[in-house]
A protein has these predicted regions:
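Short amphipathic helix-loop junctions that connect adjacent transmembrane helices
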Residues: 99-116, 194
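Structural signature of the two symmetry-related core transmembrane helices
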Residues: 41-45, 145-160
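C-terminal membrane-cytosol helix-exit motif in multi-pass small-molecule transporters
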Residues: 44-63, 251
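Transmembrane alpha-helix termini and helix-breaking/packing motifs in multi-pass membrane transporters
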Residues: 22-40, 103-108, 219-244
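Helix-to-loop junctions at the C-terminal end of transmembrane segments
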Residues: 31, 129-143, 229
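C-terminal ends and interior cores of transmembrane alpha-helices
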Residues: 54-55, 152-171, 226
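Cytoplasmic helix-loop-helix junction between adjacent transmembrane helices
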Residues: 1-16
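Pair of pore-lining "gating" transmembrane helices in MFS-fold secondary transporters
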Residues: 76-104, 172-179
Length: 252
């Protein structure tokens, strides 16, 4: 329901996060004992197993109202410019968070896999508890205002990460960033869901534009960072993420 949608999203995200708490701890232990090879094999097995349920899903045929040409025309249309810009920024920040922050941790902790796994697991566990608490609280406020607050918190979290120099700093900065992400993601995803429901038509088409925007953002940030890392340390990616995060505010 619209009234409890923030709480509902928090519960869904928390359920999906349960395995992600155990995974880094287990992966850290396996890498410390047997190296990357075993972890790679385990990851392959899990990935293949996760595809099995799709074999039992009923077949559905969805047709889009737009052609390829029309899709790109709507993608670049001035009317959708703010939405496209916001999702491109979201995709760009996702790359920094998923690729360059873990890479930074690897160098900072000097390949101490057990420590990396334990810290990551602790952060995810704290995030799960906080998400369940905050989700119910977020329903009391206007989603768009919370998105604005969430982008500011996330931007500041990225700037804080530029001064991280120890495992304790990693935990504290990541904990703060986890709270910021919960405020932003729960509010943003709830807002997007409500907008799609209110629109009532062209839902698949606008979902396609959203996904295109996110992936264009990923490509943009990778090209930008590839050039900048020749001249600046890895922490420059966090500054870029702090700037890009603010562009999520383009979403109305």
């Amino acid at each position: 329901s619209r009234k409890n949608r923030g709480k509902q999203f928090s519960v869904l995200f928390s359920i999906s996060s349960l395995l992600s708490i155990i995974a880094p701890v287990l992966a850290g232990f396996l890498m410390a004992k047997w190296g990357f090879s075993l972890v790679t094999v385990v990851a392959m097995i899990i990935s293949i197993a996760s595809m099995v349920p799709f074999l039992f899903l009923p077949k559905t045929k969805e047709t889009l109202a737009w052609t390829y040409g029309e899709t790109f025309r709507y993608f670049f249309h001035p009317f959708n410019r703010r939405m496209v810009g916001a999702y491109m920024a979201d995709g760009a920040v996702g790359i920094v968070n998923g690729v360059f922050w873990p890479l930074f941790l690897f160098f900072l902790l000097d390949g101490k896999y057990n420590a990396m796994g334990m810290i990551t697991g602790a952060i995810l566990l704290a995030g799960l508890v906080i998400r369940l608490i905050v989700g119910n609280f977020l329903d009391k406020f206007e989603k768009l205002k919370l998105v604005r607050i969430g982008t500011i918190l996330n931007s500041s979290a990225w700037l804080i990460k530029t001064i991280v120099v120890s495992a304790l700093h990693v935990f504290l900065a990541s904990l703060y960033h986890t709270i910021a992400i919960i405020v932003l993601r729960t509010s943003l995803d709830t807002l997007v869901y409500e907008k799609a429901a209110d629109r009532g038509h062209y839902i698949d088409e606008y979902t396609l534009i959203k996904e295109m925007s996110i992936h264009f953002g990923k490509i943009l940030i990778l090209v930008l960072i590839a050039g900048m890392l020749f001249f600046f340390p890895l922490q420059v990616t966090f500054i870029i993420a702090a700037v890009f995060t603010l562009f999520v505010n383009l979403l109305k």
